Structure formats: C-alpha cells, structure tokens
A protein has these predicted regions:
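Periplasmic-binding protein-like
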Residues: 115-124, 184-186, 217, 238-248, ...
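Short, solvent-exposed amphipathic alpha-helices that sit
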Residues: 34, 72-86, 167-171, 193-211, ...
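Flexible loop/turn connectors
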Residues: 232-323
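N-terminal helix-turn-helix DNA-binding module of bacterial transcription factors
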Residues: 1-57
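Alpha-helical recognition/docking segments in bacterial nutrient-uptake
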Residues: 56-173, 177, 235-236
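Hydrophobic alpha-helical segments within soluble ligand-binding/sensing domains
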Residues: 156-185, 195, 203, 223-233, ...
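Short beta-strand segments enriched in small/hydrophobic residues
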Residues: 16-19, 53-69, 182-188
Length: 323
C-alpha cells in the first residue's frame, strides 16, 4: 500500500494526497476528509518519503563515516545524531570502510533517498587525487555537503575542522621545552587531518632548532599491539627516542605498552602524547596526555550549518570553520 493507491481510491492527484499528509491548508475540508477516510480504509501509514513528495525537505540528513568502531568517529556519530534530533531531523547512517568505490556507492545511495544534506564524518572522505573527489563536487551542486574535520574546496560544501597543525605544533614544542630531543611521531594515514598533524610535528622541530629525522617518523595501523610492536622493533634496531607523539590515542596506548614492556617510567623517563582525548587515553596507567580535538564542538557546529544551508538555499561558496 502506498501513496499512489490512496490517490487512485480517493480519485485525487498524488500532489493532493501529499498536501493532505503535510497539513497544507490549500485543500478543501471535503477533499481532506475523503483522503483521510480512504487512508483509514486502506490501512495506509504515510512514510517520510511520501510526506516529502510535496515538500522541499525530507527532514532527514545522511551521515557517512568510514569506521563506526573508531572511538573518534563513534563519538562524532553520537553528537551528530543528538544534534539532528534537537532540530527535529532524522538521520541515515552509512559506514563505508575506506574503499573509494564503496564510499561513492553509499554517497549515491543517500542521494537517492532524497536526504536534505550529507555529512561526511572524519577526514578520510577527501582523497589525495583531486579527480577522486569529483563525485562530491558534482553532488554538491544539488545537495549541501558538510565535512567534519575534512576540507574540500567547492560550492555548497561546508567544512568544520580542528586546527590539527597548531595542536600538534604546540604539543611538540612543549615537549622540546621540557627537555625532549628525540621525539618519535606515529601516524595512521595521509588524510587531510593526518597531513596537517605531520606538518605541525615537523614545523615544531624546525622552529626549535631540531632536525627532522625520517627514522623517527613512522606510519602504523590504528592498532594498539601494532604500535607497541613497532616501537619495540625500532628500539631493537638501535633507534633512540625519549618521547612519542601520535596521531591517534590507540597508537599512544601502544606506546605506553611499549614503555611497560621495556620497564621505562612514564613520564619521568619517557613522554607520550596522544590525539583525540578519547576514552582510551584514560584507560592506561598512567593516563595519557591527549590533544582534545573537540569533536563534540565540531559536530554541534556542523548541524546548525547544515540546517541553515538548506533553509536559506545557500550554495555560492565554501564555508570553512576552524577551531
């Protein structure tokens, strides 16, 4: 049973049924009563798509994230959905993984659902090759696209980002001023956020008169044990480091496990700084010093931006908020 059946049985157009569903006053009382009576007789329950046929809005926002098991992204999803509910909007969540074709598939799926906007949570949706972002740019001509801690230049695209460069720069500078000289950096990816963090690390070293040593920069899967084992291997190879800064708290937990395995005292002999200030940072002994990426604030800023973007029908520029 659908809106077309109601239209046929009531002898009115689909548009009229839609106007009745949405409480449009431009329907006579007689017609309204007839449509409602037919709906009752047929046992028809309107869904959000049917209601949206006569409106410019579905009251629904699409959310995409690469990995909902990631503590940062799990938090982002929670805050986004909470904020959307406060604006009386529903959400459709798609967890895409990291494959570009899968991202494109789910992006197009959300477009087919006629959502009012699409929110891309995290920086993994902005690809290094510009042509791989074309599907987002083309879609933004029709629907607002919001990025949480990702940046893409284009019309009708709105970015809210944490200043990852400044955050890591300040953290590394503080370590150096506290006496650390051989600061190892662990990172997970070359995403928009990851590149800014890397630049912050290198710039802090240069500003403080220390060399950028490639043997102290290592990529690592976002896994606690992998981070621990990598540091153990580096130590066995004779690479000396007195502090570790990581692009994610999971890697920082691995650094703490490394220190425990080597019987190195934290923070007396060894310093560890993580990123995102997630629950993981409070689950070690001692607790990890972690940079707060302010994910809640980013998300509670993104949703009002999304709301305004399709309420006011903006689209002539890229909005860019940095915190």
């Amino acid at each position: 049973m659908n809106i077309y059946d109601v239209s046929e049985h009531a002898g009115v157009s689909i548009a009229t049924v839609s106007r009745v569903l949405n409480g449009n006053p431009n329907v006579s009382e007689r017609t309204r009563e007839k449509v409602l009576r037919v709906m009752d007789e047929l046992g028809y329950t309107p869904n959000v798509f049917a209601r949206g046929l006569g409106l410019d809005t579905m009251q629904t926002i699409g959310i995409m994230c690469s990995d909902s098991s990631d503590p940062y992204l799990a938090g982002a999803i929670y805050y986004l959905e909470r904020e959307l509910r406060s604006h009386s909007y529903d959400s459709i969540l798609c967890c895409t993984g990291y494959d570009l074709k899968v991202k494109q598939k789910y992006f197009n799926l959300l477009r087919s659902k006629r959502v009012d906007a699409i929110i891309l949570a995290g920086s993994k949706f902005v690809e290094l090759r510009p042509e791989d972002n074309d599907y987002i740019l083309k879609a933004a001509a029709e629907i607002p696209v919001m990025l949480v801690n990702g940046y893409l230049e284009g019309k009708n695209i709105y970015s809210t980002v944490c200043d990852d460069y400044a955050a890591v720069y300040d953290a590394v500078s503080r370590l150096i001023h506290s006496g650390s000289r051989r600061i190892l950096y662990l990172y997970t990816s070359y995403s928009y956020s990851g590149l800014n963090k890397m630049d912050g690390y290198k710039s802090a070293l240069i500003s403080c008169g220390l060399p950028v040593r490639e043997d102290l920069i290592h990529q690592c899967p976002k896994n606690i044990e992998d981070a621990r084992d990598l540091l153990l291997r580096l130590a066995e190879q004779g690479i000396d480091f007195d502090a570790v800064v990581t692009s994610d708290d999971s890697l920082a937990v691995g650094a703490v496990k490394y220190a425990h395995a080597r019987h190195i005292s934290i923070p007396d002999k060894f310093s560890v700084i993580g990123y995102n200030n997630s629950l993981l940072a409070r689950c070690t002994d001692p607790e990890i010093t972690s940079i707060d990426s302010r994910v809640e604030f980013l998300c509670t800023t993104t949703v009002p931006d999304a709301y305004e973007s399709f309420q006011r029908r903006r689209g002539s520029r890229t909005d860019y908020d940095r915190f």
